[in-house]
Amino acid sequence: MSPVLEPAREYPSLDTFRLSELEAVRLVLRGGSVIDWHRLNFESREEAYGLLRAQEFDLSDSDDLERIEKIKQDAIAYLRRNFDFPVPKPVANADICDLLMMASGRGHRQLCACTILKVMHIIHHLEARELLFMLPTSDQEVFHMVEQKVYRVVGWMLSSGFPIVEFIGGRKNKDSLYTKLLAKQKNIAAQIYDKLRFRVITRSSDDIFPTLAYLMRHVFPFNYVIPGESKNNILSFRRFCESHEHLRTLLPRLQIAEDIERDSMPDDNTFTSGNYRVVHFVVDM
């Protein structure tokens, strides 16, 4: 795990929202998958490094660098072995930040870099899940590490005066898990993702985008969002963006079809009140 760093006290502004941040927020709200993306939209190496930091990679740590390089080489080998996928030498030899920047560029190298990163994402995820089963580490220990990270970052947000009016965190008790399984059509315990949950209430709906962007910088990376598990019945992504001058200019540059959002998503939990308004998403950490 990377060293504990003090989160930035600068709160993201809608007036300076970057395209990469808007893409990430959109992904969270609709429960999309980065595998469906065609490109990244990082404008600087610092942005690229920020994604790595959110995944607990420390580029000053030789072990982390070795781990990243191993994942990259495994991804390239997979593509060559199964698809005879040509990877130019400059792409194959690029460090991880350069690879992320290539995926944000244009041309054949962009396509290659993006494809490699998608496979790296899958390999890293699968190997992490395997490691979780192999190591003598209990869920409680993992939960404790996640809680420490979340409480530390949200603590900085609260002390810095960010527009959060309420924060609640905790682990679901067994009764809550029983009820959730009873309410689900697919009542298998392995499909309960959100055993550790946090609730953040912002001052207004205008604060949702900046708060999500900040959390994705410091708590969880956008590519860890579980596809199909998001629910958003607070705001319409498109209408919200169209109502804000700067965000409106970014809309034509989004990479997924414009009509993919829904104004509201049905909630499969029959125990939830129809008046309950929430942006709900699940992250696999």
Report the location of each language-model feature.
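Charge-rich, low-complexity segments
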Residues: 1-180, 188-191
